[in-house]
């Protein structure tokens, strides 16, 4: 007897000091429900239909996270069979559209949240079974009595109570660690779609009586110990039944909760934008806090977000409007940009919506280049006139200058002046040096009598016979084809008048006499435009034309080239916008913007870091797959300073029914429940078998059979059970 008590003591000590791992008895999930009504969505309460597969695409949209129809035409067979009368409203089956107008077929819905609890059965399946599944009776739209007008089909002959028959529900973004044996079974009506790893695995679309589908996850090519996403979508679209049964061995995990405590929620179950976030400013868009924000719920209003509204009256590329929102009315007031000249070379002209401020160029006189230097018009000097008249090649026998009346001119360097004219000298220029030289003309050829025969515009010259031969003054012809030369015979005043043959931004070429366009005369003071002078050859008139400059673009696809109307070209690295929360934009040289998955880093071995399309990077508890997932739990141990993190397998206690064997009396069989093992044996030690029977009844411990008391069990392996007393 003494040995027996020592043995029992050791068993009690072992049980009381060993970590007990028990299968979760329940799993709670947030069911996001979207109350629908036939008034707002005619895809609800249509004619009875049939089971329709391929109604939705086989891959879940990664950005929206909801199913998409395979076709958007209501004339296709699949949509007709699936009773999708208005395909454009399908997107509101599982997405908030509570702000839609209160009119027929607006797609308006009413989001609600409930908790769905799945229980563990004796076969280690989690199940939910409800053959009268009406979770939002009297809620949503049906708070208003006028919407409570749908009853069971049998209501006339056998009156039954009202129910809310029109709603869709979803459990999305839930995770599970694949253990290698899981199954999923659904029985119910109407539409049901289940996606695992964004791939459609249960396809029970359409209006139909209860249908069944079982999925063996071992057939899906999943990898043991890898984390997967599961998304569940369900709709009830027609009277008179609403049934649902779910059975699964999948152990789901919520990756994150919103500030309302809702799994993968958006915060709208406890935050109402109108009630909680209205800042009274019509120029802002009011939003509830970020879903994963952490704060005391009484401080929701203090954590709301407010974004500035942007104008919709004009294009954001309009360079002339800098409209502001009137905080009193919420109306954007057009504010034309004032174009203020930055220097004395320009005058205000107008604002172009595509180009910005355009200024009038004041540097347009004949001796201005059209350019503005240090705030002043640049004047043509001899060098500029050489460029203009002789294409940059100086003729040393001429002097170049700009005449305010005619523009650039060149005059012979060695020409005798009329007032000192000596007809017996022949003045000429040495071309190579520009040196002036004279040769003497014989007197008989130059010294003739011209007295009284010359007017003020003539000079003395002699014929070979010595008679007078008046010649025009040498200064009358300025050798410029662009001027009209004249001399007053009474006064001797010589004038050179610029011909008006060239107009606008063109000038007359002093060498050829042609009209040449001058782009500089079109400078509009906007550094983001390229100005050209276009010559109309029929009229010899030059017209200015401005267009956005192309000089800023250097061809690097990873740089953004822009232009500031005052500063000129600006270069900034291209920022590729992210796509959703989980695709990061990256610029690849020579290619441009590409997307790559956002990398989220876990802070510990026993945390999983990944990206969620709703909130971005998240971290949550790592679930390890056990060696024998049916009978063991995977336990995660974080890394230490000396050891790496590991996953270990620990037996369930009590063991699930399928794991019990006849080889030994397991702790689970012996005790019934892990936490009560030591108590049960202690009761037996001090109270005997009858005491244990009383304890079992008082605790409500569930046993497989009426003889499940371990005190009645002999060792089937032939050994001695020290706590077994034969009934004989």
From Swiss-Prot:
It comes from Dictyostelium discoideum. Belongs to the prespore-cell-inducing factor family. The keyword Transmembrane applies. Residues 118-266 form the PA14 domain. The chain crosses the membrane at residues 667-687. It is a single-pass type I membrane protein. InterPro entries: Fibro_Slime (IPR011874), PA14/GLEYA (IPR037524), PA14_dom (IPR011658), Prespore-cell_inducing_factor (IPR051154), S_mold_repeat (IPR001673). The keyword Iron-sulfur does not apply. Residues 1-20 form the signal peptide. Residues 688-728 are cytoplasmic. This is Protein psiK. GO terms for cellular component: extracellular matrix; extracellular region; membrane. Glycans are attached at residues 61, 74, 104, 272, 326, 335, 438, 543, 638.
């Amino acid at each position: 007897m003494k040995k027996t008590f020592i043995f029992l003591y050791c068993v009690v000590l072992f049980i009381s000091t060993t970590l007990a791992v028990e299968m979760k008895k329940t799993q709670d999930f947030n069911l996001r429900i979207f109350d629908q009504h036939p008034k707002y969505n005619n895809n609800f309460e249509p004619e009875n239909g049939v089971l329709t597969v391929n109604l939705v695409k086989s891959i879940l949209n990664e950005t929206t996270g909801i199913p998409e129809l395979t076709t958007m035409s209501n004339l296709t067979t699949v949509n007709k069979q699936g009773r999708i009368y208005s395909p454009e409203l399908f997107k509101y089956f599982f997405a908030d559209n509570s702000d839609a107008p209160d009119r027929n077929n607006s797609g308006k819905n009413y989001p609600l949240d409930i908790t769905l609890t799945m229980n563990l059965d004796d076969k280690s399946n989690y199940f939910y079974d409800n053959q009268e599944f009406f979770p939002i009776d009297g809620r949503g739209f049906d708070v208003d009595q006028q919407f409570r007008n749908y009853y069971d089909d049998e209501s006339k002959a056998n009156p039954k109570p009202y129910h809310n028959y029109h709603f869709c529900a979803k459990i999305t973004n839930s995770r599970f660690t694949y253990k290698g044996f899981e199954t999923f079974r659904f029985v119910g009506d109407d539409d049901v779609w289940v996606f695992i790893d964004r791939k459609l695995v249960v396809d029970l679309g359409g209006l139909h009586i209860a249908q069944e589908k079982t999925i063996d996850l071992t057939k899906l090519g999943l990898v043991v110990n890898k984390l997967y996403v599961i998304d569940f979508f369900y709709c009830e679209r027609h009277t008179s039944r609403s049934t649902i049964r779910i059975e699964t061995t999948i152990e789901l995990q919520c990756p994150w909760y919103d500030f309302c405590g809702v799994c993968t929620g958006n915060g709208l179950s406890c935050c109402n934008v109108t009630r909680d976030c209205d800042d009274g400013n019509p120029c802002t868009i009011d939003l509830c806090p970020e879903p994963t924000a952490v704060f005391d719920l009484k401080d929701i209003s203090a954590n709301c977000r407010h974004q500035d509204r942007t104008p919709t009256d004009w294009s954001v590329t309009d360079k002339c409007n800098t409209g502001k929102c009137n905080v009193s009315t919420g109306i954007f007031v057009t504010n034309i940009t004032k174009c203020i000249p930055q220097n004395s070379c320009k005058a205000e002209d107008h604002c172009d919506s595509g180009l910005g401020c355009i200024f009038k160029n004041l540097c347009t006189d004949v001796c201005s280049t059209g350019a503005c230097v240090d705030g002043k018009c640049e004047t043509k000097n001899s060098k500029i006139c050489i460029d203009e008249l002789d294409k940059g090649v100086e003729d040393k026998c001429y002097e170049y200058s700009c005449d305010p009346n005619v523009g650039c001119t060149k005059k012979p360097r060695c020409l005798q002046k009329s007032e000192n004219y000596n007809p017996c000298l022949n003045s000429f220029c040495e071309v190579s040096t520009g040196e002036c030289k004279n040769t003497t003309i014989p007197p008989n050829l130059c010294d003739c009598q011209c007295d009284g025969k010359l007017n003020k515009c003539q000079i003395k010259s002699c014929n070979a016979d010595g008679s007078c031969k008046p010649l025009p003054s040498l200064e009358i012809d300025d050798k410029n084809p662009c001027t009209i030369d004249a001399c007053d015979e009474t006064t001797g005043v010589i004038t050179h008048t610029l011909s008006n043959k060239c107009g606008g931004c063109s000038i007359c070429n002093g060498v050829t006499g042609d009209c040449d366009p001058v782009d500089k005369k079109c400078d509009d003071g906007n550094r983001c435009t390229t100005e050209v002078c276009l010559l109309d050859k029929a009229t010899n008139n030059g017209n200015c034309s401005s267009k956005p400059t192309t000089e800023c673009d250097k061809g690097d696809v990873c740089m953004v080239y822009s232009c500031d109307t005052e500063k000129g070209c600006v270069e900034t690295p291209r920022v590729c916008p992210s796509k959703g929360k989980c695709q990061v934009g990256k610029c690849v040289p020579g290619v441009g913007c590409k997307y790559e998955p956002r990398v989220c880093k876990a802070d510990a071995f026993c945390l999983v870091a990944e990206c969620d399309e709703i909130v971005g990077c998240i971290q949550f508890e790592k679930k390890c797959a056990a060696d024998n997932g049916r009978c063991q739990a995977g336990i995660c141990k974080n890394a230490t300073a000396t050891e790496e993190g590991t996953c270990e397998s620990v037996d369930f206690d009590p063991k699930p029914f399928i794991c019990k064997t006849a080889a030994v009396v397991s702790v689970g069989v012996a005790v019934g429940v892990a936490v009560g093992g030591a108590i049960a044996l202690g009761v037996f030690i001090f109270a005997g078998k009858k005491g244990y029977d009383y304890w079992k009844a008082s605790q409500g411990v569930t046993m497989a059979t009426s003889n499940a008391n371990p005190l009645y069990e002999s060792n089937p392996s032939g050994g001695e059970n020290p706590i077994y007393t034969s009934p004989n």
